[in-house]
Amino acid sequence: MTARTGLPVNVTEDRSSTSVATGYTTSQRPNLIAGVSLTPPGGRTRLNWINLAAFTPVPGSGYGNAPRNIARGPSLWQADLGLLKHIPLGERFQMQFRGEVFNLFNRAQWGLPLADSSSPATFGQILGMVNSGPVGTGTPRQIQLTLRFMF
């Protein structure tokens, strides 16, 4: 079984390098509005994970007061199951049958939300899975059967 809390999410805003005091970077943190919850009204959904109303752009060439990694993505929970049967075939030979199921309950494992406050159309949306590869934690249910002959 694999279980973990959500990974940290760093909320940023894109700014012109001329509007940043150092001029070195265009990705800054926005200002956090005191008293406004990071959880959207009505609760979190895959298309509205972080409340955009909790942030405001930084005026002028200052820096935002939103802490680094202020939000958390969705948690991950995945159960795997494996069964094994040894079948003796005389004294010298043996057969082994093994069945494995990964993501037994076929639970969707969502990735991190988009967290660029300068893109309000997609801010807070989760558009992908934890793992987009063919194997590993976060993939859809997979069943693997193995028959092994040992001598």
Predicted regions located by residue number:
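Short, solvent-exposed micro-motifs at the edges of structured domains
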Residues: 1-151
